[in-house]
Regions:
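Sec-dependent signal peptide recognition
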Residues: 2-8
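Hydrophobic h-region of N-terminal signal peptides that target proteins for export
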Residues: 9-17
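Active-site-proximal alpha-helix that buttresses catalytic centers in soluble enzyme cores
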Residues: 19-285
Length: 285
């Protein structure tokens, strides 16, 4: 090859290398943003690690990122040197990194206030991407409710006797209309198992209602399971804590032995797949 040919070859080689360096990271990739309320509990984070692993397996070739909707948890983690982005910050970063198609997946349980705030944020950033979608949370239909209830009842330890009760703790959504989804889930639970019940921390059905039923049935033992994505502070303190106001303590005062099963819903592959099925449906649309 003559000297001119070598120079031309080197020129194009350098130009190609420069293009690769300056190429926006996301130009040839789509991104998935997994959005959750968040947790600061190291043990509870196992649930997020599990759904992250399953998402990467189900959607190879997609960039997987996370956002926490809870400012309180983000600040708490930041004090420990762990930086988590809000949905707004995450979308801005995805834009800066050059991603064109972004699929946000809500990891909330119901389409409550947190979910609708996410929808609002997505609407603001929609103009910044060729495609920006948000997929619904776990319980988005009665089919989702029935499937989730069936799976969670199957997670009760096998040594449970038929006279033992099962009590699920949901978060609840206060006065938000979507709180009725917990009521629907509670009815589905009771239809499936006469000694299984749902109560919420902040909404309906209430713990007092569930306690009254357990006392009426003269239950002596109850398995306690969080109906939440992670087994975080609510599960460890409000459900199974040693404090006087925990469900475990109140049940004990009423002669009911508690068996806590502290595992977040996102730790179960079959539950996690419901979220990912919502995401897959959106991506294929």
């Amino acid at each position: 090859m003559n000297r001119i040919g070598i120079v031309i070859l080197l020129f194009f080689s350098c130009a190609l290398h420069a293009q690769e360096i300056n190429e926006p990271k996301g130009k040839n990739m789509d991104a998935i943003l997994l959005v959750t309320f968040g947790t600061s509990d190291p043990e509870a984070k196992k649930a997020f690690a599990n759904i992250d692993k399953l998402a990467r397996e189900k959607f190879p070739g997609y960039e997987i990122r996370w956002a926490y909707t809870s400012e309180m948890i983000r600040k708490k983690l930041a004090r420990k040197g762990e930086i988590l982005l809000s949905p707004e910050e995450a979308f801005a970063k995805l834009k800066t990194d050059g991603f064109r198609n972004v699929y946000a997946q809500s990891l909330h349980i119901i389409p409550g206030e947190e979910f609708h705030q996410l929808v609002t944020v997505c609407a603001v950033f929609k103009k910044d991407f060729e495609k920006l979608t948000v997929s619904p949370p776990l319980l988005n239909s009665m089919d989702d409710v029935k499937k989730s209830v069936g799976i969670m009842l199957s997670k009760v330890p096998a040594d449970r006797r038929k006279e033992d009760a099962v009590l699920f703790m949901g978060h609840g959504s206060g006065k938000h209309p979507s709180d009725m989804i917990y009521v629907a889930a509670a009815r589905e639970i009771e239809k499936s198992d006469v000694n299984a019940f749902m109560a919420t921390v902040d909404g309906n059905p209430t713990f007092d209602e569930a306690l009254a039923i357990l006392k009426e049935k003269k239950v002596r033992k109850a398995y306690l399971l969080p109906f939440m994505s992670v087994a975080g502070e609510h599960a460890k303190n409000d459900l199974a804590g040693d404090g006087a106001d925990s469900w475990k303590s109140i049940l004990s005062k009423n002669g009911i032995e508690s068996v806590p099963v502290l595992k977040g819903m996102a730790e179960y592959d079959d539950i996690a797949q419901i979220w990912l099925e919502h995401l897959e449906k959106t991506i294929k649309q």
